[in-house]
């Protein structure tokens, strides 16, 4: 009976997004929104504050992805939900679509031909990446979600916050719910912070990897891909 269940299970391909399939990161999205404030003075002020915070973002990301999320998404505090969602298609056309790596479509096409369910797990905001994922043909995804009160962002994320071990936990729960065999599945990421996610599938791949992830991939004989 267990063997029959195993045969019926499907496999999936789990993708990180920023740095893996596209060259942009969370700061590019924040910068885009900072330049689209109501009024010139507010736009200049918000853009300057965003630029000034980049060293802080980099430092906290090296220390802890969870701390980074707390600091980074605080920058959205006070933003109108309607405006953020309104500009999401413009964000896609002007920033995200041109940033898709040349090899991304080849990887996705091969994965789909192999019958793998396509799933993205990203630390970006849900509304900001939805048009991109539709363009890439990735129907299943989980992303971070801002908390809004009376139509304005509080600067806090709703749980679960997609980062590091949380991504791996979400994948396990998704696989259990959807009948996905993780031992037959693939995972793709560029960052060592996604090591938990890469470690739970049968076929992990380091894509455009940072130094630490590349060394880990070499030690474990994982696939190393360059989509740039």
Residue ranges and their predicted role:
Residues 51, 65-68:
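N-terminal alpha-helical segment
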Residues 67-102:
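Metal-dependent phosphoesterase signature
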Residues 2-60:
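Active-site neighborhood of HAD-like aspartate-dependent phosphohydrolases
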Residues 2-10, 86, 93-228:
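C-terminal cap/substrate-recognition subdomain and adjoining C-terminal extension
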Residues 16-17, 71, 141, 152:
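Residue-level signal for pocket-adjacent positions within structured domains
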């Amino acid at each position: 009976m267990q063997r029959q269940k195993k045969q019926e299970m499907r496999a999936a391909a789990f993708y990180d997004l920023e740095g893996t399939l596209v060259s942009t990161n969370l700061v590019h999205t924040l910068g885009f929104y900072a330049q689209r404030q109501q009024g010139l003075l507010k736009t200049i002020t918000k853009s300057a504050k965003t630029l000034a915070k980049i060293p802080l973002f980099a430092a906290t990301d090296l220390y802890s992805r969870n701390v980074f999320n707390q600091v980074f998404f605080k920058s959205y505090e006070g933003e109108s939900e309607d405006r953020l969602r309104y500009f999401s298609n413009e964000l896609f056309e002007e920033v995200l679509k041109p940033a898709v790596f040349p090899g991304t479509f080849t990887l996705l096409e091969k994965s789909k031909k192999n019958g793998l369910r396509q799933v993205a797990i990203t630390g970006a905001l849900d509304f900001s990446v939805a048009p991109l994922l539709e363009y890439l043909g990735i129907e299943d995804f989980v992303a971070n979600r801002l908390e809004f009160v009376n139509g304005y962002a509080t600067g806090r994320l709703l749980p679960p916050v997609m980062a590091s071990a949380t991504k791996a936990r979400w994948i396990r729960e998704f696989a259990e719910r959807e009948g996905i065999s993780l031992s037959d599945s693939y995972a793709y990421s560029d960052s060592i912070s996604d090591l938990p996610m890469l470690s739970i599938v049968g076929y992990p791949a380091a894509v455009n990897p940072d130094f630490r992830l590349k060394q880990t991939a070499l030690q474990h004989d994982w696939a190393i891909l360059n989509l740039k």
